[in-house]
């Protein structure tokens, strides 16, 4: 059996309806922007396999650094312990994160980062003895595939099978040009009528919704409304962070 046939015997793939989807391509190696399959056919990885766009495949600098670290310390529990690489990374990240950030909590990926942020928002008020259990999100938002992240997402393609199981999320319109006041009014109304813990948003651009853009000034207005009403804000920069909008973070605008 070739690689694809062996794969199909055991594996389910994400975002795939296996009854109708084309068979996956069996890739055996990559270098920079190129991939090669098991027949040595060359492909341009035009989507950077989602996650390697800053550095390409098989980056020798990264490979050498990983090898060096593995020969020193491959893992230590982060509860009750710390280590040089994580402290150094945090020190470097604080130099580029927006200036209002003070602490870092590490997670596995974008979805679980959103999951943690939502849990922190809810537990913040729980710890204070304040009943706030609603999260505010934009219409047609996408925040990930774990449960709270799906709850905050507004695209039914990803969430319809799980409706009725989610935390309480209320949606407001995106403040696109000409509809800013509608968004402001909706946010104010939700805050006045619900016990809102947090507002999660994709800053300046909604990717999965179809690259829906809105202005920094509109986001600033929404954030001010939240701050005035003791509602925490969560900037989901999984798609926009680290230079993808021009500045290091979209929240820097």
Residue ranges and their predicted role:
Residues 1-253:
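Conserved N-terminal phosphate-binding loop of PLP-dependent enzymes in the Aspartate aminotransferase
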């Amino acid at each position: 059996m070739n690689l694809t046939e062996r794969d199909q015997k055991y594996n389910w793939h994400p975002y795939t309806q296996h009854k109708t989807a084309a068979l996956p391509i069996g890739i055996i190696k990559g270098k920079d922007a190129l991939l090669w399959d098991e027949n040595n056919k060359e492909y341009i990885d035009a989507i950077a396999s989602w996650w390697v766009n800053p550095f390409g495949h098989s980056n020798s600098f990264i490979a050498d650094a990983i090898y060096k670290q593995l020969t020193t310390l491959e893992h230590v529990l982060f509860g009750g312990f710390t280590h040089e690489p994580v402290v150094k990374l945090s020190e470097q990240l604080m130099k580029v994160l927006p200036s209002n950030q003070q602490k870092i909590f590490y997670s596995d990926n974008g979805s679980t980062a959103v999951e943690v942020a939502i849990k922190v928002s809810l537990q913040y008020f729980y710890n204070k003895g304040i009943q706030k259990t609603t999260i505010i999100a934009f219409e047609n938002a996408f925040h990930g595939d774990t449960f709270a992240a799906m709850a905050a997402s507004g695209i039914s393609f990803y969430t319809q099978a799980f409706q009725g199981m989610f935390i309480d999320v209320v949606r407001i319109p995106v403040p696109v040009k000409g509809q800013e006041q509608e968004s402001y009014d909706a946010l104010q109304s939700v805050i006045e009528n619900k016990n809102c813990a947090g507002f999660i948003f994709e800053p300046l651009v909604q990717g999965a919704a179809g690259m829906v853009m809105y202005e920094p000034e509109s986001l600033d207005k929404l954030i001010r409304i939240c701050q005035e009403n003791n509602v925490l804000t969560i900037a989901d920069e999984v798609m926009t962070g680290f230079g993808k909008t021009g500045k290091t973070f979209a929240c820097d605008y």
